[in-house]
Amino acid sequence: MPIRVAINGYGRIGRNVLRALYESGRTSEIQIVAINDLGNAETNAHLTRYDTVHGKFNGKVEVEGEFMVVNGDKIKVCAVRNPADLPWTDLGIDVVLECTGLFTTKERAGAHLKAGAKKVIISAPGGKDVDATIVYGVNHDTLKASQTVISNASCTTNCLAPLVKPLHDKIGVVAGLMTTIHAYTNDQVLTDVYHEDLRRARSATMSMIPTKTGAAAAVGLVLPELNGKLDGYAIRVPTINVSIVDLSFIAKRATSVEEVNAIMKEAAGSAPLKGILNYNTAPLVSVDFNHDPASSTFDATLTKVSEGTLVKVSSWYDNEWGFSNRMLDTTVAFMNAK
């Protein structure tokens, strides 16, 4: 029997999770039973059919009364503000994918459990009370059946952790600083408008905008041995999708460009990171990674080493599509946890 899933919040991640499910052909593993979103069902169906970043949906999407029908599969559509009031018991929901960005603590996301769901995966960094922060391919093997509310981390942590782990395992990371050069997102503004972050108050389309990110520090939640050793910030740039992590770190021992690249090539070609971490040697640009399902694509052409122990590495990621695919992977791993 497929895992019965509900999506709460049908924005960029919610829609891409659904599209990724059908595009990957994993409907025998996962069935989307319900979508809860305050938006109009017809509008959400239209936004499923047509996407500026990822193109036209390769299938059929219709609205029939209280259902959105995708390739013949009926998905109940709800518009309920309080998750505790959702009909998850009646619908037999196994996992809620919490994609609103609003219910990011176990206490708040736990409302889905009160409504009858068995488990919740938050599509954002979680509060300190969540049972675990998971980056699939790095620490999904630590999941336990007793856990109920977990975080799938952020798109940037999902790029950074698979980049750091092989390097730390082989040559060691003393400390590192990361910059994510990140496509703008819908929490920014088209024109200047009031915002508590004075830089985010500025037009996303006209400037490179430095801003904070917890992605580097969050690696410590996934790889405890690196807790407190990584930090960084984001620079939001005027592109709609695809980002790149630039990581500089001090290695525990002397290394070389050739060794670093060999480590990453080996990691990308073997479990558990195969398909999660890719390896690139072509002179590509960001648009070439649009709609790439990998969490992280290491760019061997950008590796630098200075004085043996100062290392710079870079990895590309489709910050929407890769993360949405990992939501599916984590769903299966969570339900199969022992």
Stretch-by-stretch model annotation:
Residues 3, 147, 204, 243-245, ...:
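Short amphipathic alpha-helical segments
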Residues 22-26, 165-173, 183-186, 213, ...:
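Generic secondary-structure signature for well-ordered alpha-helical cores
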Residues 1-201, 329, 337-338:
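N-terminal Rossmann-like NAD(P) cofactor-binding subdomain of oxidoreductases
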Residues 169, 173-240:
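Acidic, glycine-rich segments within the central catalytic cores of soluble metabolic enzymes
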Residues 142-144, 200, 237-243, 305-308:
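Short, flexible turn/loop "capping" segments at secondary-structure junctions
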Residues 232, 244, 248-338:
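C-terminal active-site/capping subdomain that shapes the small-molecule cofactor and substrate pocket
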Residues 10, 14, 105, 153-156, ...:
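Generic structural signal for well-ordered, non-membrane alpha-helical segments
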Residues 38-41, 126-127, 154-156, 180-187, ...:
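Glycine-rich beta-alpha junction loops
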